Amino acid sequence: MSHASKNYNAQLTAAAASTALHGTKKIYNSNENDRAVNSFLGNRTSYGEAVNGSPQYDYMRSRMSTLGSANQPMAPPSLRNRSSVYLPTPAGPPQIPVNTGKRYTLTSSSANYMTKSERQMRPPKSYDFPPSQQVRPSTSRSPSYASYNSEEVNFQSYQDPRLLPRTSQMYMPDNNYSPAVKSPAAQRRSSSYMVPANSRGSPANYNTPYYPTAIPPPIEEYSPSVSLPTSPVAEESYNNVQRSSTVRNNTTQKSVLKKPSRKMSPAYTSSYRQNSPSSQVPPVSKKHVIIYENKEGSSSSESVYEDVFEDFDPSGSNQASLRSTSTIHYTPSSKRISVIPPNTSNIGSRVVSRSGQNNNQPAQPGQYNQQSQPVQSYQSGQSTQHFQPVQPIQPVQSTQYYQPSSPVQPVQNGVPAPPMQPVQSTQYYQPSSPVQPVQNVKPAQPAQPSLEDAAKRRVEEMLRQMDITPTASSTTANNAYASAEPHPSAFPDDMNSVFSDSSFERERDSGRGRSTNLFSKFKSGRSRSKASGEAPYSYPAPPVPSVNNAGARLTLRDSGAAPEATYSLRQPSNHAYSEGRSYTFTGGQPPSVPTMPYGSRFANDSDSMMGSTADFSSKKKGGKFKAFKKFFKMRF
């Protein structure tokens, strides 16, 4: 790495590697971690060394050197305590790294990056980039050397309230671990004499020339549920909320969306239910259909009244029955369809009956969906149960029972039937029947739609559009914002923008900093004040991303101006269900954002940043390109 100071990518790659090397299961405190990463990346040029002194580089070097040495037990990386990022693992013989360059602690020069309000928001107990003293790791998993020698008492081992750390309090190091596990250094330190807690060197600093002995400040409150992380970048990389919601966003929310359409798609169902014996139909309790005299003395003496539950049809192919308040609650329509039991003498489509013999029975195909379901008919003195021919586009799974109020309509027990086309011998309907049957409905036109029904259907339509069809360039997972609650990280804790704590924003707000006016030529006023503060375009998606919105959010993107848009460090990778964040320059983009005017937004070096350099006239090219280069050199 001869040009180490120029090779910014090496650092980011090392950071990514350290992210990968560490377990992703820890719980982080979002506020301080986000700030710490940003203050690190923002300030890294304020000290001379770029790569060799960088914590990630040290970390990688010490990992490489310690991995080889056989005599020392490696603590599992997820448990490695904080300082092992900077120092070689303490268990081995103390190795002094080649270059002890500056650590990126919060020195007075970089402290100016914090505005006053931020300094109040974050009391001194939250450590900035590398901690100047040991921070207690959690031993919840397996005992590691680093954890039981840590500077503070940890809550799993010491429950005695008198032993909780005060600054000058004496306590015995824990002797519960079997000596076999302990390294010699650990035994030496945990033998029977008492050590004042504040005068012990922290185990990682033990006889290494790195830091002076650290005196821990008294710890105000420490919640044992927040375990402090391992490598600085891995640790700062994401917090609990964002991590879980990244996962949930991609899996759970998507499947929640899909749940309503779990009513199977037409193609699947038709093959699944055609001629199926009742064992395959999702458990429908046996229907008791009451057959009774038609009061209106119509041509047939018997008629069957079925409750009609009109379900929202996810495929949208059956327009006639799109009327339910939501895809999940099926509200029964007040309409009844009268079904006349068939005569055996009729000639029609074959129907498999339950008892096994075939009965002929006419079907009117294609008008309503007929879910296979037994209808009791009285016929030749004995009742056989017929299956009506099935064209299921719209199976209903519902547990509501509809109790009709008028005495004419019988109560039907069991799960209500889906819309069924009346099966009849000669005449199609009896217009005189008390329940005003639907007259030969074609699926395209709904039968007597009330205004309310129409409105409901329109809403369904809209919701389905939003949920099912992915909008241009935005994923279904992202559209989940429309129906689910917005991504938790869409509203950061301090209710400022996601970028408010980045060093860029900080120095801009305080009016200081070299790059304040860097883009003033190219930046519209709106980009400075409003958009970058309120609605960051890179991530997270706005609470309700709609197609129209997507274009509007990008208006300043083409000015090539906004630096946050160009490459946001804190953008969790939303692709491929990945759980952590990677700090490499990835080729992917934030989910619902159309491609930038120039080819690759996340470039490997500042030159390819402007992929379209050829397009500019030479004069313009010089100025703009120089600005970009300067900006990147300073920032990254």
UniProtKB/Swiss-Prot annotation:
Composition-biased stretches (Polar residues): 131-159, 166-178, 188-204, 237-255, 315-354, 400-412, 422-439, 572-589
Keywords in alphabetical order: Cytoplasm
Top-level taxon in the UniProt lineage: Eukaryota
| Record keyword Cytoplasm present | yes
Gene Ontology process terms (BP): plasma membrane organization
Q: Where are the transmembrane segments?
A: none
Q: Where is this region: Required for targeting the protein to eisosomes?
A: 1-297
A GO cellular-component term linked to this record: cell cortex of cell tip
Show which residues constitute the signal peptide: none
Low complexity: bias regions: 355-383, 471-484
Looking at the record, which segments are called Disordered? 111-205, 222-284, 313-387, 400-451, 467-550, 572-604
Provide the assembly information: Component of eisosomes, large cytoplasmic protein assemblies that localize to specialized domains termed MCCs on the plasma membrane.
Q: State what this protein does.
A: Important for the biogenesis of filamentous eisosomes, large cytoplasmic protein assemblies that localize to specialized domains on the plasma membrane to cluster specific proteins at sites of membrane invaginations.
Name of the protein: Eisosome protein sle1
Q: Record the organism.
A: Schizosaccharomyces pombe (strain 972 / ATCC 24843) (Fission yeast)
Lineage summary: Eukaryota, Fungi, Dikarya, Ascomycota, Taphrinomycotina
Q: Which gene encodes it?
A: sle1
